[in-house]
Design a protein with these regions (language model features):
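Conserved short loop/turn motifs at secondary-structure junctions
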Residues: 7-14, 87-89
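Residue-level encoding of the coiled-coil heptad register
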Residues: 2-6, 13, 20, 27, ...
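Short, compositionally biased low-complexity segments
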Residues: 1-2, 116
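Hinge-like oligomerization/junction regions that interrupt long coiled-coil arms in large cytoskeletal
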Residues: 21-173
C-alpha cells in the first residue's frame, strides 16, 4: 500500500506540474491575444512564437516610443508598417514566413534588422528650415540604439510640421 501511495503521489506531482505549465502557457497566450487584439491573425500567431523563436523582436508599434503630442503624426507616417514584424535577421523572417505558410495562418511583412540601414535621409535639407517644421520624424521618437536603422528606414525621410498648410507648402517646393 505504501509503494502504491508513493507512486500515486509521484504521478500526482507530475500531473500538477504539467497542469501549471500548461496554465501558464495559456495565460501567456491570452495576454498576447489581448495585447495584439486588432492585429491580423498572422501577426498574432507570429507574436505567440516570440518566446519560443529567438530573433523575433516585436511589431514596429512595440519598438517605437513616441511622445503624446507626436503620436498622430508618427502613426500616420508609419501607416501599415506600424504592424510589421521586426526580426534580428533574414533567417528568422524566413523561418516565420515558412511557419505562416505551413499552418495557413496568412501573410505578414517582416523587417529584418540586418536589412535596415536607413532611408538615405531627405534630399533637400533646406526644407528643414521652412516655417512650421518640427523636425524629421525619426528624431521625434525614441528607440533602443539597435533599432536606429529601422527608425531611419521608416521615418528618416518624413518631415513633421505643425500644420497641414505648412506641409503642403513644403511639398510644393
Amino acid at each position: 500500500i505504501q509503494e502504491t501511495l508513493k507512486q500515486q503521489n509521484t504521478q500526482l506531482e507530475r500531473e500538477q506540474t504539467s497542469y501549471h505549465r500548461e496554465a501558464s502557457r495559456l495565460e501567456s497566450l491570452r495576454n498576447i491575444t489581448e495585447r495584439y487584439d486588432g492585429y491580423g491573425n498572422s501577426i498574432r500567431r507570429v507574436m505567440e512564437q516570440k518566446n519560443h523563436v529567438p530573433g523575433i523582436r516585436g511589431v514596429v508599434a512595440d519598438i517605437i516610443h513616441v511622445e503624446k503630442n507626436y503620436e498622430i503624426a508618427i502613426e500616420t507616417a508609419l501607416g501599415g508598417s506600424i504592424q510589421n514584424i521586426v526580426t534580428d535577421n533574414e533567417d528568422t523572417a524566413k523561418r516565420m514566413i515558412d511557419f505562416l505558410k505551413r499552418n495557413k495562418f496568412g501573410r505578414a511583412t517582416f523587417l529584418p534588422l540586418t536589412s535596415m540601414h536607413g532611408g538615405g535621409g531627405i534630399r533637400n535639407l533646406e526644407a528643414l528650415k521652412e516655417p512650421g517644421v518640427i523636425g524629421l520624424a525619426n528624431t521625434l521618437i525614441h528607440v533602443e540604439s539597435r533599432f536606429d536603422g529601422l527608425a531611419d528606414q521608416l521615418l528618416g525621410r518624413t518631415i513633421v510640421v505643425d500644420h497641414i498648410d505648412h506641409g503642403i507648402a513644403i511639398a510644393r517646393k
